[in-house]
Amino acid sequence: MKRIAVICAYPKHNPGMYSVDLGLGSIVNTLEKVKVTRFNIQDNYSIKSDLYKLKYNLLYDAAQLENFDKIIIWGDFLLWLLYGKHEILSKQRKNLTYDQIFEKWSNLIFLKNRPDLQKKVIIYGTTLYGINSEQLSNNDYLSMLSELCDNAQSISFRDVFSANFISQISQNKNVSYRVDCAFHFNTDKILKNIQDSPYLCYSFGRSGCDAKLEEFAKEVANSMNLNAVNLNWLDKSGLPGLINKISVIKGSSGLITDIYHCGITGMRESVPVIGIGMGASTISSTLSDKKKEVFFTQSFANQNYIYAESILNPENKTNLIADTCLKLSNSHAHEIINSFIKKKTESDKDSLIFEILN
């Protein structure tokens, strides 16, 4: 039996993170004699629905990983300094200092000074797209990032920027760009939502102008003679809620969203997707809009990405609605996008399986 430890982000209430972690489950469930144990560094946590379940163990000491054959660092921003500084600190006990949090992050995510463990590591689907020289001026961070990546078995990032950045920081030659982990989530068990009439679904919550974006989505739907359905992607309905949202997306005629993993879900389900984000957004946090723009561009779908500023400009409104309707109706373009994504997802899955088993 091959034992696999998977280090994940803390997923509570985040449907995108559930999709990410179910993606690995869809892969390893096809493998014989492979046992997966999920860890995060914040808390013991479990959640289930009628179709799926996820269980996370608390990782509090790197020694817990010693008896595993492989260690997968899976998804999200786990290796980015801003994640360690803000995400983890915000979810820890208030009596811990930042220095204590940083040390914990260093030891449990980067496996600092543990080359024996680092050599077992497969880095998959994480991102460093916002890394910069100011962050790299933290010598401790640069040192432990280089050390982990030099020793890792393989490094696969979810965006082209991260794959390029790490190749300049690490001597490891086994570096690649692969799809977001959520693309590996096999949703065949989830049935399409069947409604009386065709509909366009939407969900917003990241770009800071939800009401205006909702108004825009409804006008697009009306122009296409479709009902408009709000997914409420970011509500706290947990794993059962995610399953329902996927069902609604599967049955829709299209999706308009400013939420990264909501857009990925639409593309995975072969639904036409319009992504929205602030063109003036800077890369200042894990929720910055630029990650959506990068994703749509590297997926040959940049024509389906709209700057929110354009929607907020009333002079653009009529033409933008008409143009968005045309983009949602361009079946040939969507077939090309879906074809590339499906081929790459399958190829990346095969590569990951090989790395797990060898």
Label the predicted regions.
Residues 1-358:
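Active-site anion-handling motifs in enzyme catalytic cores
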